[in-house]
């Protein structure tokens, strides 16, 4: 079987087993998390929900933009004046959790400082339900918030986990 998202877009995959079956997890350029049966390539039954975009399967997909907490259009994504975000490395699976990093505007000479924060998202590997979100720029009441000036958490986001993630499954 073959699964194609976009030509020349190979960021890698995450892999796990559920009830003895292999599952492949992919983050797409449009910031969707897709779970596929590793043997058949079919969308994983019971994972995610209906994405409000024509042509998507009824199961096997999570719209991660919805979990970032910013207004967006399912067809167009986040308005470019608000920011830009995509997946730049594969998701990782740690125990029962699929963890997804992302990338904001790419390159060393970014055109602006305003952007959507590249928060790290974690999903249940069985259902696709959001388990937690790590705010890369601390919000009020979170550890380290006072070290960010000018309410940076509200308007800047050129902080993200663009490189491949790693984790210690025992801790």
Question: Where do the model's predicted regions map?
Answer:
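Aromatic (tryptophan-biased) beta-strands that constitute blades/sheets of beta-rich domains
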Residues: 1-5, 42-80, 129-137, 143-155
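Flexible loop/turn segments at secondary-structure boundaries
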Residues: 106-108, 139-142
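Contiguous hydrophobic segments
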Residues: 38-46, 162-164
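Repeat-blade elements of multi-bladed beta-propeller folds
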Residues: 6-32, 83-110, 117-119, 152-171
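Short acidic, glycine/serine/threonine-rich loops at helix termini
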Residues: 36-38, 110-111, 146
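Beta-propeller blade signature
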Residues: 36-41, 115-130
């Amino acid at each position: 079987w073959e699964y194609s998202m976009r030509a020349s877009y190979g960021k890698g995959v995450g892999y796990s087993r559920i009830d003895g079956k292999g599952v492949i997890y992919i983050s797409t350029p449009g910031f969707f998390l897709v779970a596929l049966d590793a043997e058949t390539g079919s969308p994983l039954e019971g994972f995610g929900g209906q994405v409000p975009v024509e042509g998507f399967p009824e199961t096997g997909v999570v719209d991660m933009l919805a979990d970032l907490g910013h207004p967006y259009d399912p067809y167009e994504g986040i308005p470019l004046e608000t920011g830009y975000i995509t997946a730049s490395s594969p998701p990782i699976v740690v125990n029962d959790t699929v963890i997804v990093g992302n990338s904001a505007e790419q390159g060393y000479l970014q055109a602006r400082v305003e952007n959507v924060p590249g928060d790290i998202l974690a999903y249940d590997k069985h259902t696709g339900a959001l388990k937690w979100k790590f705010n890369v720029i601390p919000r009020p009441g979170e550890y380290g918030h006072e070290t960010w000036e000018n309410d940076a958490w509200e308007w800047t986001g050129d902080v993200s986990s663009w490189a491949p993630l790693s984790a210690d499954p025992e801790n």
